[in-house]
Amino acid sequence: MPGWLTLPTLCRFLLWAFTIFHKAQGDPASHPGPHYLLPPIHEVIHSHRGATATLPCVLGTTPPSYKVRWSKVEPGELRETLILITNGLHARGYGPLGGRARMRRGHRLDASLVIAGVRLEDEGRYRCELINGIEDESVALTLSLEGVVFPYQPSRGRYQFNYYEAKQACEEQDGRLATYSQLYQAWTEGLDWCNAGWLLEGSVRYPVLTARAPCGGRGRPGIRSYGPRDRMRDRYDAFCFTSALAGQVFFVPGRLTLSEAHAACRRRGAVVAKVGHLYAAWKFSGLDQCDGGWLADGSVRFPITTPRPRCGGLPDPGVRSFGFPRPQQAAYGTYCYAEN
């Protein structure tokens, strides 16, 4: 009858349509990957210190019996840290992060992980793994924190830290050792520093925007690398990373010694700010103060967001340093930090 497809014509049409769809989708057998877990729409989740972050993990369907295992892939180490295991009904947390982590459970196929009170050490790569006893599968996501990288050296001068001392020094200044990706991001934002420093992965590098002879030669700008280093014996500076503050930094004027600076902050219900506090206040709160002030490590610094004459002498915003004056020198104010 006119207007009706014949059987051979219908078969040819269906074969053509299947072929086009098959080519567009790819052959599942030739592209191994998740069968139960859906690939994440965004593989990088952005957050900041103190926030609540959600790492999405969603099942397309559920096998008859399964568990979901969340873990954190530790940078520079061939191991994963277990965070949480759930069977869809009950969940159990493990380790220091497990106490701040829970399942979102927005619906029956939701295996997303919620992390409360995000900390600096939470940044990194995470794995959501479905275990069904036959063919396990996983998806990976990265938690990225908004922050700022700052170079750090002690009062004794440059190249004093082995890897473990550099790690401790950053933590004492309200930070942690920066990762390579954090240093790279800082370089794209203008960080130019000619002293090599440890990174979290155990590498030693330094960022150069203006190539020059005393700073790795006159080659192209970039991140210079010293290659593999001995974590115990080799000594360099540190590149630290910090993020948004839970409190505020403020300046107390005066001509104070370091001990008088501590007393001045205590009278105001605060403590002398750490280096990481000052960098975070400069980066996230726009702190701009053309006065040197004591910090907790004994250094004297001041933050500039709007460069101007007779205020550091440099054309770019940043945190300027007067080094480490004698603690008894009564010549500076102080920067205090108070929790909200």
UniProtKB/Swiss-Prot annotation:
Residues 1-26 form the signal peptide. Keywords: Disulfide bond, Extracellular matrix, Hyaluronic acid, Immunoglobulin domain, Repeat, Secreted, Signal. Expressed only in adult brain. Pfam families: V-set, Xlink. SMART domains: IG, IGv, LINK. One of its GO terms (cellular component) is perineuronal net. GO terms for biological process: cell adhesion; central nervous system development; establishment of blood-nerve barrier; extracellular matrix assembly; skeletal system development. Disulfide bonds join C57-C128, C170-C240, C194-C215, C265-C336, C290-C311. GO terms for molecular function: hyaluronic acid binding. Residues 148-242, 245-338 form the Link domain. It is found in: Secreted, Extracellular space, Extracellular matrix. Residues 34-144 form the Ig-like V-type domain. Belongs to the HAPLN family. Mediates a firm binding of versican V2 to hyaluronic acid. May play a pivotal role in the formation of the hyaluronan-associated matrix in the central nervous system (CNS) which facilitates neuronal conduction and general structural stabilization. Binds to hyaluronic acid. This is Hyaluronan and proteoglycan link protein 2. It comes from Homo sapiens.
